[in-house]
Amino acid sequence: MFNIYALSVLCLFACMPNESKQSMSENTLPSMKKSIHEFIVTDINGQSFDFSTLKGKKIMVVNTASKCGLTPQYKGLEALYNTYKDKNFVIIGFPANDFMAQEPGTNEEIATFCSKNYGVSFPMMSKISVKGKDMHPIYRFLTSLNENGLEDNQVKWNFQKYLLNEEGFLEKIIPPSTEPDDEQIIRWIEAG
């Protein structure tokens, strides 16, 4: 009888490591997520932009367009940037022509438009695609749970905002229609 009991206990413990291995691999998924600091992109002037230079700063990544009903958000983005740029916060704009061809211009035309109409001084990157088969790798990172460790999501429209912490990890996604000075964005920036 003792042998049967001992064998039962032994079998029970023999089965447990598989569960432990499974839960251990599930628990390690977040450690496999990427940081935006791993990316190097091209800015609107054709120069290399290394996101690792932003370590220690909170980052807002936003896809932009010049001929969209939300284009006036450039004004709010610029005001937000000027208020917090000296407090370890930066906005990175990515022009994209994915929604109703609302960003048809060249990089030079986009830069001129942003400067002339909104005084944009936050870093603007070269025009990319934020969805579909031509999606830029940085947006694959932002929209894929396997890469960002937060969630799968889609860019819904121009001016969708991605908030990343000082380590470059995605923390929050803000809908396009939410203004840059929205209380939830301000709270996130100011949170220690």
PLM feature spans:
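N-terminal "domain-start" segment that seeds a small globular fold
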Residues: 20-52, 72, 136-137
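Amphipathic alpha-helical repeat scaffolds
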Residues: 43, 63-67
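Structural microenvironment flanking redox-active thiols in thiol-disulfide oxidoreductases
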Residues: 70-136
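Proline/glycine-enriched tight loop/beta-turn segments at coil->beta junctions
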Residues: 54-59
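Thiol-/selenol-based redox modules, centered on thioredoxin-like
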Residues: 137-140, 144-192
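C-terminal motif of bacterial Sec signal peptides marking the signal peptidase cleavage site
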Residues: 13-14
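Sec-dependent signal peptide recognition
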Residues: 1-9
